Amino acid sequence: VNFPPLGPSDFTADLWGALQPSTSERGRGLRALCGSAYSLPLLAPSACERWLAEIAHARARAPSSDPPNSMHDHGVDLVRLGFGPRIDALLARLQPLLARLYPQFDGARLDSHHSYLVEYGRDLDESLAWHADDSEVTLNLCLGEEFSGAELTFLGLRCREHMQTRPTADEVRSFEHEPGTLILHAGLHRHRVEPILSGTRRNLIVWARSTHLRRGTPPPAASYCPLHG
């Protein structure tokens, strides 16, 4: 079963403002967080609830599978469950915004992705150590549910050469997730997940990738890494 793309009523007015080409509306609802990171209210509450229900239904019918990557003990690959077309359509809808925010990471030509659900809570993943993603740009969309803790902490954008360097005090910034709100960041922007204190948090993670960039010349580190000043 393939799940269809989300419809216009599933998205917030903030998304339409952020996608506007005119300067009068451009960026409405888009919030700069730190470095490469931004947040945007994306989905209506009903869309989040429906997506979680669809995921639960698909998981109940699918054979058990391994976690989506080596960092997580829980979660599921959403493409394997049939959500690939929906996520393809979501990336296409966001493409003008990604092109504008991430030109150095080929945001205009993100043509593949690894997409999965992460789950934090009691008897689920409780936190996540610092890391960078195997993506040009990462989309982190909170779908629910009720929870406290499990904040996303950023630790500075680095090239591969300087990935192990300490972050400055200004680079360490934590942000709470809110259901329906999307957080965007460069894949090389280091981050971790703080311990969850109560409830359950479920997020859609999309590692968006550019075949053109990966087959060609990588972006110059000086265009994004502060240690190449």
Positions of predicted regions on the chain:
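Catalytic core of non-heme Fe(II) oxygenases with the double-stranded beta-helix
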Residues: 103-228
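Non-heme Fe(II)/2-oxoglutarate
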Residues: 17-107
